[in-house]
Curated annotation (Swiss-Prot):
It catalyses: a ubiquinone + NADH + 5 H(+)(in) = a ubiquinol + NAD(+) + 4 H(+)(out). The keyword Transmembrane helix applies. Keywords: Electron transport, Membrane, Mitochondrion, Mitochondrion inner membrane, NAD, Respiratory chain, Translocase, Transmembrane, Transmembrane helix, Transport, Ubiquinone. GO terms for biological process: ATP synthesis coupled electron transport; electron transport coupled proton transport. This is NADH-ubiquinone oxidoreductase chain 5. GO terms for cellular component: mitochondrial inner membrane. Pfam families: NADH5_C (PF06455), Proton_antipo_M (PF00361), Proton_antipo_N (PF00662). Belongs to the complex I subunit 5 family. It is an enzyme of class 7 (translocase). GO terms for molecular function: NADH dehydrogenase (ubiquinone) activity. It is a multi-pass membrane protein.
Length: 610
């Protein structure tokens, strides 16, 4: 009976979420209130329904794999429509629905003047459905459908304000960088189909025991690096801030950017014994978390600071995959979703109240004018730094404890600890510039947060940012044996580096506040502010070099060869000997011509006489 309720609840969730999309296909124009009455209500209802399988799982540990029907048969190769409702999908679905419900409610206020708001909500709903398909998929083909779904919806949503050149560029960047990752996923799927003759995830785990999976796993790491913005494929993530703030909140909290990490979590049994892949994930994640945290230190755009913090946390999740602790990475995904969505909604509230101003240097004093938003932003920033008893602490502290007691790679540990300290610095810098001191914005700014569409979503996410970590860790037993003993210094290392970062940030803030002259631009500051020169090299130098070589080749091949050497010059070279031969006797020498004439006449007379 419980199994029927369990599966029926998930089926009902899909039906309810699809209903607004189906109803929008009607030829009649949608009424203005459609986005609130249909989309928000559907997501809200789905969240409460998703609690039913969650409670059944917590009570009985019930999981299920449901195969609905057979899609395609190619000889012995079957592709089924199959759903896997295990711990990961059962917990992640309510989290994603809860966060999306809050974001949609906030978007009703934030996007109220947009003429295409109904279409905007439809895109957000499709984005969510694609992510749920990805999370619940039990085969690679179905997972790929969800994977491409979040990719194309991110393109449409980042480029929502398509009349802005920056938004179009950012949307193209997102889709191109993700295409690089998609190549890795497609090649991995092709290898698995050729060598294991199956895409069913459970079958892959069984069939792969005696195979060397290094090549397909490298493809999966490339796919995760593209989707989750790891170092090398990260520039699209800060650029994605060109989209509306609700898009940024949904993109960074519970949908697209965690899809790559979730792929590795879902397929982790394939890589748990492959040291090369685990080391690759560990080093890639450590490099990402440090580099992006360093870039966040000098940014002045409030949304870009939060965006780089997302990339840094994704690097931390990748480190956890490399430590062979996928359940900790999943825990961090769930806790991170709440405070990251809240940080973006608070940023959106501030931006809207300050006439679309995003520069934190032009803010200040908002703790008096926007008290609720300021309090929530502070709570979210503290949760991000891993402050004890907030949700981020339960996952972040466990990850760093796991790193401290592992014997894998000391460099990765050091980089991660430095990045943790940097997280505290840029979080406090954001609070100091945006909320404290005196106002630095025009006095006519329409500062106002007295709207339930602003207060309620942020309040719900604040509850999640405070309680989610405690609730999840209290109800879910660990999947692996936890560390039993640890020296006090190792236990407190995460907290110590966070406190060091906070103290350093306070010292830097006081120095900045009391300085009398501008600080000279240091090379390290320039490196961080220019994002490690990465966009300049990849987006300018490489295309410029390609253009230069292409131009060089085209001018030599087409202009010099065809237009000159093969065309006019070739004709000239062929005609010149004939011209010289015919013009040689005609050199203007009259005496010679007369002599030849007389000789010719004499010979002619003699011939005639004879």
């Amino acid at each position: 009976m419980n199994m029927i309720i369990f599966n029926s609840a998930f089926l009902l969730i899909f039906i309810i979420l699809l209903y607004p999309l189906i109803s929008s296909l009607s030829p009649k124009e949608l009424y203005p209130n459609w986005s609130s009455s249909h989309v928000k209500t559907a997501v809200k209802t789905s969240f409460f329904i998703s609690l039913i399988p969650l409670f059944i799982y917590l009570d009985q540990g019930l999981e299920s794999i449901t195969t609905n029907w057979n899609w395609i048969n190619i000889g012995p190769f079957d592709i089924n429509m199959s759903f896997k409702f295990d711990m990961y999908s059962i917990i992640f679905t309510p989290v994603a629905l809860y966060v999306t419900w809050s974001i949609l409610e906030f978007a009703l206020w934030y996007m109220h003047s947009d003429p295409n708001m109904n279409r905007f909500f439809k895109y957000l709903l499709l984005f969510l459905i694609s992510m749920i398909i990805l999370v619940t998929a039990n085969n690679m083909f179905q997972l790929f459908i969800g994977w491409e779904g979040v990719g194309i919806m991110s393109f449409l949503l980042i480029g929502w304000w398509y009349s802005r050149a920056d938004a179009n560029t950012a949307a193209l960047q997102a889709v191109i960088y993700n295409r690089v990752g998609d190549i890795g996923l497609i090649l991995s799927m092709a290898w698995l189909a050729m060598n294991l003759n199956s895409w069913e995830i459970q079958q892959l785990f069984i069939l792969s025991k005696d195979k060397d999976l290094t090549l397909p796993l490298l493809g999966l790491v490339l796919a995760a690096a593209g989707k989750s913005a790891q170092f090398g494929l990260h520039p699209w993530l800060p650029s994605a801030m060109e989209g509306p703030t609700p898009v940024s909140a949904l993109l960074h909290s519970s949908t697209m950017v965690v899809a790559g990490i979730f792929l590795l979590i879902r397929l982790h049994p394939l890589m748990q014994d492959n040291q090369l892949i685990l080391t690759t994930c560990l080093c890639l994640g450590a490099l990402t978390t440090l580099f992006t945290a360093a870039c966040a230190l000098t940014q002045n755009d409030i949304k870009k600071i939060v965006a780089f913090s997302t990339s840094s946390q994704l690097g931390l999740m990748m480190v956890t995959i490399g430590l062979n602790q996928p359940q900790l990475a999943f825990l961090h995904i769930c806790t991170h979703a709440f405070f990251k969505a809240m940080l973006f909604l608070c940023s959106g509230s501030i931006i809207h109240s300050l006439n679309d101003e995003q520069d934190i240097r032009k803010m200040g004093g908002l703790h008096k004018l926007l008290p609720f938003t300021s309090s929530s932003l502070t709570v979210g920033s503290l949760a991000l730094t891993g402050m004890p008893f907030l949700s981020g602490f339960f996952s972040k502290d466990a990850i760093i404890e796991s790193m401290n007691t592992s014997h894998l790679n000391a460099w990765a540990l050091i980089l991660t600890l430095i990045a943790t300290s940097f997280t505290a610095i840029y979080s406090l810098r954001l609070i100091f510039f945006a909320l404290m001191e005196y106002p630095r914005f025009p006095p006519l700014s329409p500062v106002n947060e007295n709207n339930i569409l602003v207060i309620n979503p942020i309040k719900r996410l604040a509850y999640g940012s405070i309680l989610a970590g405690l609730i999840i860790t209290s109800n879910l037993p660990p999947m692996k044996t936890q560390i039993m003993t640890m020296t006090p210094l190792l236990k407190l290392s995460a907290l110590l580096v966070t406190i060091i970062g906070l103290l350093l940030a306070l010292e830097l803030a006081s120095l900045t506040n009391t300085q009398l002259k501008t600080t000279p631009t240091l090379s390290t500051h320039h490196f961080s502010n220019m994002l490690g020169y990465f966009p300049m090299v990849i987006h300018r130098l490489v295309p410029k070099t390609n253009l230069k070589w292409a131009q060089h080749i085209s001018t030599h091949l087409i202009d010099l060869t065809w237009s000159e050497k093969i065309g006019p010059k070739s004709t000239l070279i062929q005609q010149t000997p004939l011209i010289k031969l015919s013009t040689q006797p005609q050199q203007g020498m009259i005496k010679t011509y007369l002599t030849l004439l007389f000789l010719t006449l004499t010979l002619a007379v003699l011939i005639i006489a004879i």
